[in-house]
């Protein structure tokens, strides 16, 4: 934390630990009882389905690339969420940074919230890094599949070097960022190796979020889904790394034991896609509510 800009550190500490966790949690509990429904700790939003890459097995690709939530629609979701006690917002996509100007405006308007953004990082430049430094409440989670060969094979030739440049820029600006890594039946050993982990530490990452490959979306490849034995191997590797390395690791699927099982359906989070459909999970594309036709509370009270 000594390498993070002190004003950014202060803002994130207040927004995450006080607003999202202390104040927010008590408001969520109150509203769960009041409205007899789940109220999430975090809301995932797709600002857009557009993306500048075309990655193998992308769960978001089935939406196409022409859907968008407007600035006012995202702003309304955040306003409604804060009334329920939600101060943590996570952007997925598409590539959220194709809407970088709107995202910065939302950071400015809702300076009491934390905004985490899953991004391929290829659109992070010095101007945007300076804007992040100014608003202080935006954290990228950068997608990497391991080394250069593994990343480029899924995300396109030259992607890895663009990502590394973005990581170096963020580190130079003293901005916190993390990594999002998808492990498969092919890369699960490499992506949890000491070599990979140490390289991320050296480049200034502060956390890593692991997801196992889900065969949905564009050009899905079921053979890449890790088998139970491979998932068990990753389970133990992540716990070893978490205990021995200064880079905090989270495993989206295998850490369910720490949060009482599945967190979807508004229990701890929900997903709103770029068409406004409210899904229980980013990997479960079923919805009977659209944020353009109902309030956030009404969506939470719906059967799905």
Model-derived segments and spans:
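Conserved alpha-helical substructure of the radical SAM core
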Residues: 1-127
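A generic "binding-loop/recognition-motif" signal
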Residues: 51, 147, 284-287
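ATP/adenylate-binding site constellation spanning eukaryotic-like Ser/Thr protein kinases
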Residues: 52, 137, 293
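A short, flexible beta-alpha/helix-coil linker loop
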Residues: 61-65, 147-150, 215-218
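Radical SAM/AdoMet-radical enzyme domain recognition
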Residues: 74-91, 97-211
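Radical SAM enzyme [4Fe-4S]-AdoMet core and its adjacent flexible, acidic
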Residues: 152-265, 274-275, 279, 283-294
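Short, solvent-exposed cationic patches
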Residues: 291-304
